[in-house]
UniProtKB/Swiss-Prot annotation:
Its cofactor is [4Fe-4S] cluster. Its EC number is 4.2.1.33. Keywords: 4Fe-4S, Amino-acid biosynthesis, Branched-chain amino acid biosynthesis, Iron, Iron-sulfur, Leucine biosynthesis, Lyase, Metal-binding. The keyword 4Fe-4S applies. Pfam families: Aconitase. Gene3D superfamilies: Aconitase, domain 3. Belongs to the aconitase/IPM isomerase family. LeuC type 1 subfamily. It catalyses: (2R,3S)-3-isopropylmalate = (2S)-2-isopropylmalate. This is 3-isopropylmalate dehydratase large subunit. It comes from Alcanivorax borkumensis (strain ATCC 700651 / DSM 11573 / NCIMB 13689 / SK2).
Length: 472
C-alpha cells in the first residue's frame, strides 16, 4: 500500500462520510471568525433557532474594517457599514458564547496572525474561516482553507463541512536562499513559475531544504499565497520549528496532553513513498528579490530585470492580459524594474505583518529617511501583541524617525475596505498578497514585494535591489 501525503493524512483523520458523487463530510476542528463574512451566518442560526454545535471551536476578532488609527469604541468608526459590522460581531459573539478578541484587547488583530499566535491553530487541525487566506494556517501542518458565508453557518451549526477531496501537489524548493531573498520572494517566484492557475484543484505541500530553513513566520507567508497560485490550501510538514512555535501558547495543550499531542504531530509528514499528482521542483539559487509589475500575482519579475514584452508572449490570452495590465499600471515594456517610482508604501497584511517582517523593514529604515517623493509609508502590525513586541524592541521609533507612520493592527491597505487606501494612479510598494485592479483603492496600482524591498522603495522613492541598497 502506497504511503500517504500530509494532505491525505489530514483528510482521512477528519473524514466523517463519503458519497458516491465524490463529495464528503469532514469534521472541522477550528473556525476563525471576523466581522465581514459572519453576520449572515449568525443570523441564519438565529432564524433557525439553532445554537453553535461547539462554541469552544470558534474564535473571533475584528480586522478587515477597523481603522488603523487609534479608536476606543465602535462608535468612533466613521464608516457606517464598517461600524455596523464591528458592532454586529461583538453582539453575535456575546449572544452565542464565542470568544472574541475585540476593541481594546491586545490580542485583537488580523485573523491569520491572531489564531496561530494564540495557539488556536495547532498541527493536525482542520481550520476554516470566511476568508480565502485561511491557507496561511497550513504552515502549521493543518488543512486550512477559506469558506463562504453559508458554510460559516453550516460549520457553526454542525462542526462539519461538505467538501470534495483535492489532488496533491508538492512544490519542493531545494538549496540555500541567497542574500536579500525572503519567504515572500520564494512564493512570488513560485507563482511566477506555475501561474495563478497552476495550483487549481490541488492542495499544495511546500517542501525542500529552503522551505525547512524558513521560520514559522516565513512559512505562513508562503502558505498565505497558495491561494494566489490557484490552490485552496497550502501546507508545510511538522518539524522542530513547528513544535517550538506552538509550545507554550495560550490555547496549546499542556502537560501530559502536550506530550500526547507532540507525539501525534510528529507523524504529520508525507511518507517517503507517498505519491503526488503533480511535482514542481525549484532551485533556491534561481530566486531573486521579486517585484510584481502587473495586475495578477503571476506578473512578477526579479528586481534586476526589465519588464517583459507582450509581443514575446505566444499565448494570445496572456498577451492580451499583459497589454491591459500595462495600460492599467501606466508602465512600459522593457523598462527596468528599478525605474518604477512609488507614491505610497504599505508594510502589513496577513502575508507580512509579523514581528520578523517588521524587523526586516526596520533594518532597512534605520538611519534612513522616507524619500520626499513618497506621500505615505504605512507600517501596520498584524496584531496588538506584534505591536507590543515591536515597541519593546524600539522598532516603532525607527519607523517614525524614518518618516513612516506606525499604526494600530488591522488589514489596512491590503484591501480598500477601511480608511487606508490608494488614490487613482498611485503606485504602491505593498507587502500584501493581491495586485488586482482596484484592490487597494479605485485606480490604485499595486506592486507586491517583501517587507525589506518595500522599506527600500520607501527610502529611495523607487524600487531598488535590496542587495545593493547602500549603492542605490
Amino acid at each position: 500500500m502506497a504511503g500517504k501525503t500530509l494532505y491525505d493524512k489530514l483528510w482521512d483523520a477528519h473524514l466523517v462520510a463519503e458519497r458516491e458523487d465524490g463529495s464528503a463530510l469532514i469534521y472541522i476542528d477550528r473556525q476563525i471568525i471576523h466581522e465581514v463574512t459572519s453576520p449572515q451566518a449568525f443570523e441564519g442560526l438565529r432564524l433557525a433557532g439553532r445554537q453553535p454545535w461547539r462554541t469552544s471551536a470558534s474564535v473571533a476578532t475584528i480586522d478587515h474594517n477597523v481603522p488603523t488609527t487609534p479608536f476606543n469604541s465602535a462608535a468612533d468608526i466613521t464608516d457606517e457599514t464598517s461600524r455596523i459590522q464591528v458592532q454586529t460581531l461583538e453582539n453575535n459573539t456575546r449572544e452565542f458564547g464565542i470568544t472574541e478578541f475585540g476593541i481594546g484587547d491586545v490580542r485583537q488583530g488580523i485573523v491569520h496572525v491572531m489564531a496561530p499566535e494564540q495557539g488556536a491553530v495547532v498541527p493536525g487541525m482542520t481550520v476554516v474561516c470566511g476568508d480565502s487566506h485561511t491557507s496561511t494556517n497550513g504552515a502549521l501542518a493543518c488543512l486550512a482553507h477559506g469558506i463562504g458565508t453559508s458554510e460559516v453557518e453550516h460549520v457553526l451549526a454542525t462542526q462539519t463541512l461538505v467538501a470534495k477531496k483535492m489532488n496533491n501537489m508538492r512544490v519542493s524548493v531545494e538549496g540555500e536562499l541567497g542574500p536579500g531573498v525572503t519567504a515572500k520572494d520564494v512564493v512570488l517566484h513560485i507563482i511566477g513559475v506555475i501561474g495563478t492557475a497552476g495550483g487549481t484543484g490541488y492542495a499544495l505541500e511546500f517542501a525542500g531544504s529552503a522551505m525547512r530553513s524558513l521560520s514559522m513566520e516565513g512559512r505562513m507567508t508562503v502558505c498565505n499565497m497558495a491561494i494566489e497560485a490557484g490552490a485552496r490550501a497550502g501546507m508545510v510538514a511538522v518539524d522542530d520549528v513547528t513544535i517550538d512555535y506552538v509550545k507554550g501558547r495560550p490555547f496549546a495543550p499542556k502537560g501530559a496532553d502536550w506530550d500526547k499531542a507532540e507525539a501525534y504531530w510528529r507523524t504529520l509528514v508525507s511518507d517517503a513513498d507517498a505519491q503526488f499528482d503533480q511535482q514542481v521542483d525549484i532551485d533556491a539559487a534561481d530566486i531573486k528579490p521579486q517585484v510584481s509589475w502587473g495586475t495578477s500575482p503571476e506578473m512578477v519579475v526579479p528586481v534586476d530585470a526589465h519588464l517583459p514584452d507582450p509581443a514575446a508572449e505566444t499565448d494570445e490570452v496572456k498577451r492580451s492580459g499583459m497589454t491591459r495590465a500595462y495600460e492599467y499600471m501606466g508602465l512600459t515594456p522593457g523598462m527596468p524594474v528599478t525605474e518604477i517610482k512609488v507614491d505610497r508604501v504599505f508594510i502589513g497584511s496577513c502575508t507580512n505583518s509579523r514581528i520578523e517582517d517588521l524587523r526586516a523593514a526596520a533594518e532597512v529604515a534605520k538611519g534612513r529617511q522616507k524619500a520626499g517623493s513618497v506621500k505615505q509609508v504605512l507600517v501596520v502590525p498584524g496584531s496588538g501583541l506584534v505591536k507590543q513586541q515591536a515597541e519593546k524592541e524600539g522598532l516603532d521609533k525607527i519607523f517614525v524617525e524614518a518618516g513612516f507612520e506606525w499604526r494600530e493592527p488591522g488589514c489596512s491597505m491590503c484591501l480598500a475596505m477601511n480608511p487606508d487606501r490608494l488614490e487613482a494612479g498611485e503606485h504602491c510598494a505593498s507587502t500584501s498578497n493581491r495586485n488586482f485592479e482596484g484592490r487597494q483603492g479605485n485606480g490604485g496600482r499595486t506592486h507586491l514585494v517583501s517587507p525589506a524591498m518595500a522599506a527600500a522603495a520607501a527610502v529611495a522613492g523607487h524600487f531598488v535591489d535590496i542587495r545593493e541598497l547602500d549603492q542605490a
